[in-house]
Amino acid sequence: MKRAVYAGSFDPVTNGHLWMIREAVELFDELIVAVGVNPDKHCTFSVDERVALLREVTSGFSKLRVDVFENQFLVNYAQSVGANYIVRGIRTASDYEYERTMRYINSDLHPDITTLFLLPPREYAEVSSTMVKGLIGPRGWEGVIRQYLPEPVYRKMLSMYSEQ
């Protein structure tokens, strides 16, 4: 069985993340979307909210499950869930440099786990959770962020930030 892990903070999940998930689901028998928890990182959404939003926007995928991992190398988590692949998105040259280094480290730790890089289409190449959150504030932000987020996430962002 070909099982893969696609990990991130998903704070919030974007249409770029969903593109990655759609592509990876087609490549593997099972995809585990793993929400990483970093206690040193301030997140907009709690881990429970991120998991719930991911489950909602991926409910149509039968070969997918959402999980959480904390305080361990991704490759060790992948090994613990029986995954033989790690899927990573490459949007920029700096993403590539970082992910290439991590791929070599992962290979040193678990040579049996392959890291696979996916390059998103142009319309998602600049989309990140950080970018979306950075657009919030100026008049009209609600219309601007809509194109980058799945509808349930967009509604959650509206309810969160419209109250402020």
Swiss-Prot record:
GO terms for cellular component: cytoplasm. Keywords: ATP-binding, Coenzyme A biosynthesis, Cytoplasm, Magnesium, Nucleotide-binding, Nucleotidyltransferase, Transferase. Its main location: cytoplasm. It is found in: Cytoplasm. The keyword Transferase applies. InterPro entries: Cyt_trans-like (IPR004821), PPAT (IPR001980), Rossmann-like_a/b/a_fold (IPR014729). SUPFAM superfamilies: Nucleotidylyl transferase. Pathway: Cofactor biosynthesis; coenzyme A biosynthesis; CoA from (R)-pantothenate: step 4/5. It catalyses: (R)-4'-phosphopantetheine + ATP + H(+) = 3'-dephospho-CoA + diphosphate. Its cofactor is Mg(2+). It comes from the Bacteria. Its EC number is 2.7.7.3. GO terms for biological process: coenzyme A biosynthetic process. It is an enzyme of class 2 (transferase). The record marks 17 as: Transition state stabilizer. Substrate binds at residues 9, 41, 74, 88. One of its GO terms (molecular function) is pantetheine-phosphate adenylyltransferase activity. ATP binds at residues 9-10, 17, 89-91, 99, 124-130. Reversibly transfers an adenylyl group from ATP to 4'-phosphopantetheine, yielding dephospho-CoA (dPCoA) and pyrophosphate. Homohexamer. HAMAP family: PPAT_bact. Belongs to the bacterial CoaD family. This is Phosphopantetheine adenylyltransferase. It comes from Chromobacterium violaceum (strain ATCC 12472 / DSM 30191 / JCM 1249 / CCUG 213 / NBRC 12614 / NCIMB 9131 / NCTC 9757 / MK). The gene is coaD.
